[in-house]
Amino acid sequence: VAHRDEQGRVVTTGPGERIADLDALPEPAWDLFPVDAYLDRHQSGGVDRGRSMPLLTSRGCPYKCSFCSSPQMWTTRYLRRDPARVVDEIARYVERYSISNVDLNDLTAMLTKDWMIDFSRAMIDRGLEVSVQLPSGTRSEAVDAETARWLHRAGVRNFCYAPESGSAATLERIHKKVKLPRLRASLQAAIEAGLTTHASIIIGFPHEGTEELLETYRFVLQLALDGLDTVAVMVFAPYPGSEEYDRLREQGKIIHDERYFYSSLLRSAGATRSIHPRWSASELAALQLAFLLSFYGLAYARRPGRLAQVGRRVLAGRQESVMDQFLSTKLAQIMGGVMGGVMGGVMGRTEAAG
């Protein structure tokens, strides 16, 4: 905790002791918050599946990705809640707020097979008719065919993987403990179980060369062939407090200002400063676009029926994938602009006539 003393000096208390028993913590005091204003607008960290509540099942992450600040904030001690208590909380939200979806916003929501199956069984036993999304990404090691089937039966619909790179050298440099063949096997199991799958990719790591970038490009194309539904390709922007951020700031390659905090939230490479020693922001933006066009072009060429399904869902006002969400948002913006122009023209003619 940081605060100012009576003389106006900044005082920090240092790291607090970790709370080990997460089940002893009270639920968020949503009654003190205008939560219905968000539920009515279908605010969600994932796709629009109706009235969505955010929920945490754990704290921390046992991994140490170099671009993430979790090791510094939470350490690598991973603590999680009893799955039955998590389901109890979901049931209360269903009764109290009539929710239809839950977003598990954990740093690492699904880590062990036993926990996932216990959670699924509890959801099924309670008969809760809510969908579950994992918009923040999760590990693939414990998600096999059996686990994927349990998750789908329990209402899990959107599953996000976070390989970040298709280059073994890059994965080693960023301390990303992921085996790409294992991730692809997990992805296949999730697809066969009926889950809508998404993956996040990062390009533009300062140490990334052309060969590593091409390896990631080929991996993204392989995911398209494997049947991945959607992909997000983002430009490297390390979290403040992370290993990469602190190193680059010491080297003077990151300017610690408001623009960095703002631009790091944007998906467009053109809105960010390039940290890469060779590739400019505009070049990274072009690479980002090339990755996305290649993935979706190949994915829909391989499975053309999916594109028709996306179109039908968008026209029907339903969302099941990130692509549905993207196109629905763009359609709403276009329609809003058209209606604004029409109304502006009508008002202008009315004023002229008056």
Regions found by a protein language model. Name each.
Residues 29-198, 203-205, 211, 215-218:
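Radical SAM [4Fe-4S] cluster-binding motif and immediate context
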Residues 243-248, 253-354:
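Radical SAM enzyme core and accessory elements
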Residues 16-19, 59, 108, 237:
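Glycine-rich beta-alpha junction loops
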Residues 1-22, 241:
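Glycine-rich beta-alpha loop elements in corrinoid/cobalamin-binding modules
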Residues 2, 6-7, 218-227:
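Basic phosphate/pyrophosphate-binding loop/patch that engages nucleotide-derived ligands
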Residues 63, 113-114, 169, 173-174, ...:
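Flexible glycine/acidic-rich beta-alpha junction loops that bind and position SAM and/or redox cofactors
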Residues 14-17, 70, 107, 307:
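Short, well-ordered beta-to-alpha junction loops that form the rim of enzyme active sites
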